């Protein structure tokens, strides 16, 4: 192979590696607590959400999926004092969102799944504010650090995310009823929750197809140049 061809191969190889790296980027969904769900330690003694969170890496555009019931709430804040006090009622900085309001009066709690987008870098704090912070004080809390990663999707910004409350099923007394899924308004979810595994790296089918095509392109060109 001539020196010029060898240089071309090296350039193409570098370009292919860069393309593969870019196409491999994908937003992630993290199921909080995995099979434990989102409950205080009085209900789930094995729950250790901070330990779970410390084993993950979070970036902008990722989602946290809270599988819980209508008797537990999901509160997100950027204020450490609010988090430490397990109390969001007196928060005055407009930096706290109650994604799911609990319903303590319900005689038969219904399963609920809440999808929370990560739209701000830095420290993000989560807890259940139900029963005057009692659930939070009994282990239902954790903090994470969100990095920039590949940034937010083009169609989203921190102001796009609404904070809807849980919608109860019409069969509230049926323990086997499928959980409702609450997705923030005007925010493109990176994957279909129902068809994906816990903590599985995901992106759209278009991205997956693009990765495959890029890989094939690289292998074909490398094979062609290797034959010379």
UniProtKB/Swiss-Prot annotation:
Q: Where in the cell is it found?
A: Cell membrane
Instruction: Output compositional bias ranges, type Basic and acidic residues.
Output: 188-204
Phytocyanin domain: which residues?
A: 28-148
Membrane topology per record: Lipid-anchor; GPI-anchor
Q: Where is this region: Disordered?
A: 148-211
Q: Which Pfam families match?
A: Cu_bind_like (PF02298)
Matching SUPFAM superfamilies, A to Z? Cupredoxins
Q: Which residues form the propeptide?
A: 205-228
Residues modified by glycosylation: 29, 71, 94, 145
Q: Which UniProt keywords apply?
A: Cell membrane, Disulfide bond, Glycoprotein, GPI-anchor, Lipoprotein, Membrane, Signal
Q: Which GO terms describe its molecular function?
A: electron transfer activity
Q: List the disulfide bonds.
A: 86-136
Q: State the tissue distribution.
A: Mostly expressed in seedlings, roots and flowers, and, to a lower extent, in leaves, stems and seeds.
Q: Which residues bear GPI-anchor amidated serine-type lipidation?
A: 204
**Which stretches are tagged as biased composition: Low complexity?**
153-170
Question: What's a GO cellular component annotated to this UniProt protein?
Answer: side of membrane
Q: Does the keyword Lipoprotein apply?
A: yes
Q: Where is the signal peptide?
A: 1-26
Protein role? May act as a carbohydrate transporter.
Protein family according to the UniProt entry: Belongs to the early nodulin-like (ENODL) family.
Protein name according to UniProt: Early nodulin-like protein 18
In its UniProt entry, the species of origin is given as Arabidopsis thaliana
Phylogenetic classification of the source organism: Eukaryota, Viridiplantae, Streptophyta, Embryophyta, Tracheophyta
Q: Which gene encodes it?
A: ENODL18
């Amino acid at each position: 192979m001539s020196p010029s061809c060898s240089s071309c191969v090296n350039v193409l190889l570098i370009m292919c590696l860069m393309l593969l790296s870019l196409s491999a980027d994908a937003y992630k969904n993290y199921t909080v607590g995995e099979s434990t769900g989102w409950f205080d330690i009085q209900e789930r003694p094995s729950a250790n959400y901070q330990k779970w969170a410390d084993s993950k890496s979070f970036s902008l555009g990722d989602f946290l999926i809270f599988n819980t019931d209508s008797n537990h709430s999901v509160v997100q804040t950027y204020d450490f004092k609010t988090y430490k006090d397990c109390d969001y009622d007196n928060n005055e900085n407009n930096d706290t969102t109650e994604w799911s309001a609990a319903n303590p009066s319900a005689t038969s709690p219904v399963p609920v799944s809440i999808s929370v987008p990560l739209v701000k870098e830095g420290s993000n704090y989560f807890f259940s504010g139900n029963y005057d912070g009692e659930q939070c004080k009994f282990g239902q809390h954790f903090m994470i650090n969100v990095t920039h990663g590949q940034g937010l999707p083009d169609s989203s910004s921190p102001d796009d995310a609404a904070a809807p409350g849980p919608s109860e099923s019409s069969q509230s007394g049926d323990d086997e009823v499928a959980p409702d899924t609450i997705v923030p308004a005007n925010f493109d979810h990176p994957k279909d929750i129902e068809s994906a595994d816990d903590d599985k790296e995901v992106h759209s089918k278009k991205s997956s197809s693009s990765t495959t095509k890029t890989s094939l392109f690289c292998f074909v060109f490398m094979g062609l140049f290797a034959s010379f």
